[in-house]
């Protein structure tokens, strides 16, 4: 069991992945030695393992080790990235099959087709976790119905100074001021292409020389530069698709070095590079961690960005906009109108909040400062109610005709059901997944199936906006 003590595997997600691997190794060994084991359903393990994680492992990771949350995050992606890159070869292929058995739930009741894309379930990974597509091909094996990469910017950028990610355990929340740290749009294209090449090499019996992660070079990061013009970028579409089991979204942000007046060109540059790689795209104008970005939610500025992207898009890919929870109702209504005018595919509601009045946490231990002194956005449980209110408002404003991806404070099946019945066709998690562990996805999906059965509904799409339908008689 040496792998359990590896110093490079310390995040909650990594530990739990290896715990699952250890469990299956144990049963396989026992069977090979002729011992008699009763076949146990995977569901029987989920509740006790959740209890072990929440009462034993999580307190150690969050408190006793006092490890930097960003460092733990990087360790998680390092492991998942290795699984993604080597997924067609043993032992990764075997590990991935065990992940699927443990974390995935297949049920026709929670499947739906939206924008011509088949979603095996409505629960996706929110943007921010896998900014550079390190583990793009693995998320379906962890039970997610879709995954959103990014936020990615046209120019590579380091983000804000560290520390920039803090856990607020008392609130089941996180405070982040990451600042769109990423390798840039071109590097994401190269990484996704490398994952595709890895698959083709294995299928064709070619030697794959290295398991080393893709690292963007200075030349690759600088190949696409501002100023942009319609003739600057002519990326070649992928010769072969990634053929993922789930839809892949890409979240686009503005480069920090780009003036606000050039924002439309900046978003366009990223979209041109990535449009053949994503199944849908999200325009992020709502992060509180890039100076002036939220001002792009203003009708004039946002209208120009959306018009520019849709002219390039020509209706080929679903484009959504992600909004802040801190907007007034009139401002949200304006965004909804713009979404309709520019024929957007939907709205993502919501991003993180800059409010602090709902927090129990008063001081950030890592910095010694008051939570009110620390810049950044709050995600997690404190955001649940407001994001649901925004979802309900948008659903009512559009009579349910504009699909919504609901995100903010989802930890349980009840939280997920609340957002779906408020009007969200799809939902996303990030902070909740970190707190609850990887079994959370399957637990939520099983809870949604149960709620559909209790209400006599045959499909998750029938539950979308159910609160509004019932209120209207």
What do the PLM-derived regions correspond to, one by one?
Residues 159-172, 358-372, 434-457:
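C-terminal helical cap(s) of enzyme catalytic domains, especially alpha/beta-barrels
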Residues 173, 183-186, 191-199, 298-319, ...:
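Alpha-helix-loop-beta-strand connector modules within alpha/beta enzyme cores
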Residues 148-154, 346-353, 421-443:
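Glycine-rich phosphate-binding active-site loops on the catalytic face of alpha/beta enzymes
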Residues 48-196, 200, 213, 242-245, ...:
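N-terminal capping/small domains of soluble enzymes
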Residues 3, 7, 15-27, 37-46, ...:
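Short, basic, low-complexity termini and linkers enriched in Ser/Thr/Gly/Pro
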Residues 255-267, 295, 321-340:
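Active-site glycine- and acidic-residue-rich loops that bind
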């Amino acid at each position: 069991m040496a792998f359990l003590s590896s110093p490079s595997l310390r995040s909650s997600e990594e530990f739990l992945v290896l715990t699952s691997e250890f469990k299956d190794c144990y049963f396989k060994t026992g069977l090979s030695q002729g011992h008699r084991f009763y076949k146990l359903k995977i569901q029987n393990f989920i509740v006790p393992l959740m209890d072990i994680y929440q009462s034993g492992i999580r307190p150690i990771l969050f408190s006793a080790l006092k490890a930097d949350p960003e460092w733990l995050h990087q360790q998680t992606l390092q492991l998942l990235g290795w699984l993604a890159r080597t997924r067609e070869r043993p032992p990764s292929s075997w590990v991935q099959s065990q992940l699927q058995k443990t974390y995935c739930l297949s049920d026709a009741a929670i499947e739906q087709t939206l924008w011509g894309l088949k979603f095996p379930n409505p629960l996706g990974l929110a943007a921010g976790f896998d900014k550079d597509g390190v583990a793009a091909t693995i998320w379906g094996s962890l039970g997610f119905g879709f995954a959103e990469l990014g936020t990615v910017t046209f120019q590579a950028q380091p983000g804000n100074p560290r520390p920039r990610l803090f856990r607020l355990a008392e609130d089941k929340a996180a405070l982040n001021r990451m600042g769109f740290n990423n390798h840039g749009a071109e590097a994401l294209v190269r990484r996704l292409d490398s994952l595709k090449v890895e698959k083709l090499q294995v299928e064709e019996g070619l030697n794959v020389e290295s398991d080393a992660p893709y690292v963007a070079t200075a030349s690759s990061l600088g190949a696409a530069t501002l100023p942009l013009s319609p003739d600057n970028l002519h990326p070649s579409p992928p010769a072969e698709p990634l053929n993922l089991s789930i839809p892949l979204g890409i979240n686009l942000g503005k480069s920090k070095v780009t003036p606000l007046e050039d924002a439309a060109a900046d978003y366009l540059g990223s979209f041109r590079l990535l449009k053949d790689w994503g199944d849908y795209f999200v325009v992020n104008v709502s992060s509180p961690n890039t100076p002036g970005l939220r001002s792009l939610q203003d009708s004039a500025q946002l209208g120009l960005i959306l018009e520019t992207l849709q002219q390039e898009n020509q209706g080929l890919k679903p484009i959504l906009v992600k909004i802040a929870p801190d907007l007034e109702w009139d401002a949200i209504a304006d965004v909804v109108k713009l979404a309709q005018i520019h024929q957007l595919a939907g709205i993502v509601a919501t991003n993180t909040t800059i409010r602090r009045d709902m927090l129990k946490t008063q001081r950030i231990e890592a910095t010694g400062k008051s939570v009110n002194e620390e810049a950044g956005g709050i995600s997690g449980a404190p955001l649940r109610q407001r994001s649901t209110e925004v979802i309900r408002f948008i659903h009512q404003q559009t009579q349910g005709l504009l699909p919504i991806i609901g995100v903010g404070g989802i930890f349980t099946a009840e939280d997920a059901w609340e957002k779906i019945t408020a009007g969200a066709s799809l939902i996303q998690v990030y902070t909740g997944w970190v707190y609850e562990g990887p079994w959370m996805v399957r637990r939520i999906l099983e809870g949604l199936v149960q709620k559909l059965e209790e209400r006599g509904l045959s499909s998750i799409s029938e539950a979308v906006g159910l609160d509004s339908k019932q209120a209207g008689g």
